[in-house]
C-alpha cells in the first residue's frame, strides 16, 4: 500500500511539474510573440481564460488562427504551389472575419489587424487583388469557378 501511495505521489508531482514546464514555455513564447509555440505548448490543456495562463492561451489561439494562414502562404509559395498559396491568403481574410469578435474580446485586435495588413499587402503587391476583390473571391460559392479565378490571377489574366 505504501508503495502505491509513493508511486502515485511521484506520478502526480511529475505531471504537475511537466504542466508547469509547458506553461512556462507558453508564457515565454507569448512574450516573444511566438503564438505557434504557445498553441503547441498548451494544446489539450483546459485553462480558464479569465486567469493569466488561460488568457495567454486564448489570445494566442486567436492570433495563431490568422497567422497560420499567412505562414501557409509562405510555405506553399516555397514549395511552388501557387494556387494553394493564393488560396491561403484568401482564407486568411475569411479567418479574420471569423475571429474578429474573439480578437476584440481578448484585446488582440492590433495583432490580428497587423497580420491582416500583411495579407492584404501581399495580395495587392503579388496578385493585384484588393480587399474588395478578395472578398468577392471568398464568397464565390462554386469551387470550380473559384479555382478558375485563382488560376486566372496567377497567370495574370
Each model region followed by its residue ranges:
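Extracytoplasmic/periplasmic/luminal assembly and interaction segments
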Residues: 36-87
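Non-cytosolic head/periplasmic domains of membrane-anchored proteins
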Residues: 70-157
Amino acid at each position: 500500500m505504501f508503495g502505491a501511495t509513493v508511486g502515485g505521489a511521484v506520478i502526480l508531482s511529475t505531471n504537475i511539474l511537466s504542466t508547469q514546464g509547458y506553461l512556462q514555455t507558453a508564457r515565454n513564447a507569448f512574450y516573444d510573440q511566438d503564438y505557434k509555440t504557445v498553441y503547441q505548448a498548451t494544446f489539450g490543456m483546459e485553462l480558464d481564460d479569465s486567469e493569466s495562463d488561460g488568457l495567454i492561451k486564448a489570445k494566442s489561439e486567436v492570433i495563431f488562427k490568422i497567422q497560420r494562414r499567412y505562414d501557409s502562404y509562405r510555405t506553399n509559395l516555397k514549395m511552388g504551389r501557387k494556387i494553394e498559396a493564393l488560396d491561403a491568403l484568401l482564407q486568411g481574410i475569411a479567418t479574420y472575419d471569423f475571429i474578429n469578435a474573439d480578437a476584440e474580446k481578448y484585446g488582440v485586435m492590433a495583432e490580428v489587424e497587423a497580420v491582416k495588413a500583411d495579407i492584404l499587402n501581399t495580395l495587392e503587391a503579388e496578385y493585384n487583388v484588393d480587399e474588395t476583390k478578395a472578398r468577392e473571391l471568398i464568397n464565390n460559392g462554386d469551387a470550380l469557378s473559384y479555382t478558375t479565378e485563382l488560376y486566372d490571377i496567377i497567370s495574370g489574366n
